[in-house]
Amino acid sequence: MEPNSLQWVGSPCGLHGPYIFYKAFQFHLEGKPRILSLGDFFFVRCTPKDPICIAELQLLWEERTSRQLLSSSKLYFLPEDTPQGRNSDHGEDEVIAVSEKVIVKLEDLVKWVHSDFSKWRCGLQAGSVKTESLGRNGQKEALLKYRQSTLNSGLNFKDVLKEKADLDCLGEDEEETNVIVLSYPQYCRYRSMLKRIQDKPSSILTDQFALALGGIAVVSKNPQILYCRDTFDHPTLIENESICDEFAPNLKGRPRKKKPCPQRRDSFSGGKDPNNNSDGKSVAKVKCEARSALNKPKNNHNNCKKVSNEEKPKVAIGEECRADEQAFLVALYKYMKERKTPIERIPYLGFKQINLWTMFQAAQKLGGYETITARRQWKHIYDELGGNPGSTSAATCTRRHYERLILPYERFIKGEEDKPLPPIKPRKQENNSQENENKTKVSGAKRIKHEISKSKKEKENAPKPQDASEVSSEQEKEQETVNQKSITEPLPIADTKKKLEGYQDFAARPLVSQADPEKDSETDQGANSEKVAEEAGEKGPAPPLASAPLAPTPGTGKQSLTSPSALVDSKEPKPCCFTESPENELQEASFPGFSTTQPPLANQSEVEDDKLPAMADYIANCTVKVDQLGSDDIHNALKQTPKVLVVQSFDMFKDKDLTGPMNENHGLNYTPLLYSRGNPGIMSPLAKKKLLSQVSGASLSSSYPYGSPPPLISKKKVIAREDRCSSLSQAHHGQSTDHMAVNRPSVIQHVQSFRSKPSEERKISDIFKHDKLSRSEPRFSFSKHHLSPSKKSRGRRTVEKRALPHSHMPSFLADFYSSPHLHSLYRHTEHHLHNEQTSKYPCRDMYRETENSSFPSHKHQEKLHVNYLASLHLQDKKSAAVEAPTDDQPTDLSLPKNPHKPTGKALGLAHSAPGPQESKGTSQFQVINSQSRDCHPKACRVSPMTMSAPKKYPEALSRSGKPHPVRLENFRKMDSMVHPILHRKMSPQNIGAARPIKRSLEDLDLVIAGKKARAVSPLDPAKEVSGKEKASEQESEGSKAAHSGHSGGTSEGHKLPLSSPIFPGLYSGSLCSSGLNSRLPAGYSHSLQYLKNQAVLSPLMQPLAFHSLVMQRGIFTSPTNSQQLYRHLAAATPVGSSYGDLLHNSIYPLAAINPQAAFPSSQLSSVHPSTKL
């Protein structure tokens, strides 16, 4: 036949390397065209002398390099044609296959076919299906399709079948001598099927069920069915000249085991690949010893060439390459060290340590990083390195290792140093996954964008140390990062580091002592807080809170809940940082009205307070954010890097100037507290709206969502902080602390007061006394500060914080009503409400009034609060004297009277008894209260009697300028309000309260409008208060003592009497409706009850008064803070139920926490941690 008679039929069915695979080919047999396709059986005679055998065509391909048309076939011989011959075990229809396939050129295969096969008489003569009947019902196509699908691996043979059909139309019967070889199981099934249908027409074999059961429909005229179940080694087949196994295709996939690079390259090198691989192939395909012997020499020859080629490079590698490798490594390590990214350890890839020289050489051979990446050839580099072939991420891991270890040097060599390097975050994350996880855990506040960016910076700054560093080193890095951030911010690095160290020490001690289970987390939190503190510098106290509020469990939440003392300790160092940080200066600049003399102490105490309750800081932070939106002071503090409210608070902590963030921390901490439990750093749209409305309402100096919170700095805490931070903060203390306390007393002081609570808890009674003394001083400074709305806010916060130590809950009330004017307003409100609603919920109304009056007097409130706190400090000694004046004031029946007398003791007890829990909770409350003071709606009407924690409350009374009796009455009213927690309605401040509620927003708007604007507009009221504060400072002092006694009494008399006044605003109307009234137990009466029903005042339940600030600040929003708050309340009040008990007892049921019946529930819901209590 002519060579050109051979041609492929159909389209190619596959490509692999140099091979193109086909399904069929056509040739001419005796002048007749015939098509052989994959899977076809046909008779062949290998040589004229050889017996007839059956060939099964298994593979057809063309080698592009040599243009050879090749086939691979399996040969079947009759048993008698094998060396062993036929025996009794062989069946009549059995054939035996040659163990090795034969590779034959198509032209030779065609020659094999040209023979006379008429002598073949073996095989089962199967009845053929008549093509006429098949043609009529279309079964022939179906039959052929079935055969091709089952016998040809599902390849599409339509085109081949079409060609065959065309040949049939020409009358060419190429299947005249059709033969089929089955496996033994197939043959058995076929015979079984024939037996079952023996009496039926053969066409039934085309039935799909018959085919499925093993029937075979043969359309050829003389089909012969045979089966094969054994193989043999043909002795002389390998000697056939037509068989050319050297052309066997190399169809191996990727090597499952590492092969020498040269062999692998040769295997992919094209034309000679089959020969090179014929060694393996021959063993696999030909078991004949002769065949193997023939193939081995070829392979050995090829291998010899390879070896000879490889031996020289190996020798060179042994000598030259070693020198080159050493020089390369020296240069690489030197360069990487110079660029501040030293190669500390060489990573492992595929369970094998990377050879940097091999990796570099392989990359250069493939064209370098850019080329390899573009061509996606990193897997080749991985293979060169000899890694585990089973890795599914080999390419990515190899590329990242190269980017981190070698790419900078490659760019340096090529003079492309200016070319930006690809981001190596994934690489860093892989190396520092554990450390990064720890960091994430430690700084939960990193969720906030700002903090996230800082964490990224930290990671970038400390990725290398992280690789080898332990958790401690991670914390150190965090601290370093914080320091760096602090440096970025005004806070000095040294001071930041010192603060961080002190903070770590304090945080570690209290955490360890207070909550072993949370010890680790707290330590991490402490480190995180330190880190944040360093980052935020002045923000120091707030950043830990910020991070904690964002991730309350990892950081602030745990500290505040687990160990108030730890918080105090950790936060105390932060106050130092705060004092030192330029943020204080910013705050001072922001709030120039604040006097610098008092603020340092206030800042220290604030810092301590901030340290004590992380949630408080968180709340303060939140407040700051709100303030920064709403108040110029806060905005000044935050203006460096203001962001979204809640997010901003945390971001502010980290990214804002240290001074600004410190001041902001109190306010910001409030806002984060709002969202800290449930959504650390994440606010629902409704909450955001409310918070924004609060912020807009708090645009004024006292425009904190809760009104500018009265200073939460307790002098005791301030003093403690001064002692702790004096060394660090002395440089910045005069400026930063004063500025901080003065600039943003409400926010920072609130936060600081919370933070300082843990330490206060440790020495509550002593601190309470000390606080009173300290507060007296801060009160005056703050009063000066309060002269300006910003100063008042800061002073108030500072005072609140100072008052906090005395009675966490009472001091919180004092915070809420720290300013004398607010306090008096609160007292009036309390009195009127008591008179009006004594039977029902006088406290609630009082709270509303207080809120209303509180906002107008917010600025004064800060001032008053400071004075009041100072008074509380003084009144710890003069509690009895102050109690009388308070009694003179119209008393709200809902408020307990006895708290006035125990002010000093009760407050001390409240601080000491609550221990970490109460101090934390109180701190948080105080923070909230101070914020509420900023927009104190609750205490607005009771202007003289701003109800904050007992200490703060007396201060507020003193500052209110009202007689101590009025303050005491207000405090009592607050106490009673604590029981009847129904003052949500007074929630113009509630808007600023824990959670921005629609009603809160409305109230805030009203406050802004001037209806409840007194409490709602902290700035303007703060201004008013500033004037009032001066007059009311004296009163504050007197009423401070009275209120301290009152709060203390409340604490002793009720589980949460002091707290109650603090929380009513938080929970019920006061919580949402009146920031000032939150001290009152108005909505608190029954923790669950009043939380659920603001209208229900249950004396059974110790009034857990959450200041609206507290609620707005999110104290209850974060489960940790709320629990801590509750615990603080329980500890503070002799009623003896812990926060957990209170929470469990429904003092702060979820519904109670969100007492929106009396006031817009949205406010509480956004803040309350009800779902997490």
Curated annotation (Swiss-Prot):
UniProt modified residues of type N6,N6-dimethyllysine: K340
Tagged with keyword Nucleus: yes
A GO term from the CC aspect: nucleus
Keywords assigned: Activator, DNA-binding, Isopeptide bond, Methylation, Nucleus, Phosphoprotein, Transcription, Transcription regulation, Ubl conjugation
Domain of life: Eukaryota
ARID domain ranges (all copies): 322-414
Location(s), subcellular: Nucleus
Ranges of compositional bias, category Basic residues: 253-262, 782-796
Pfam families registered for this protein in UniProt: ARID (PF01388)
Official protein name in the record: AT-rich interactive domain-containing protein 5B
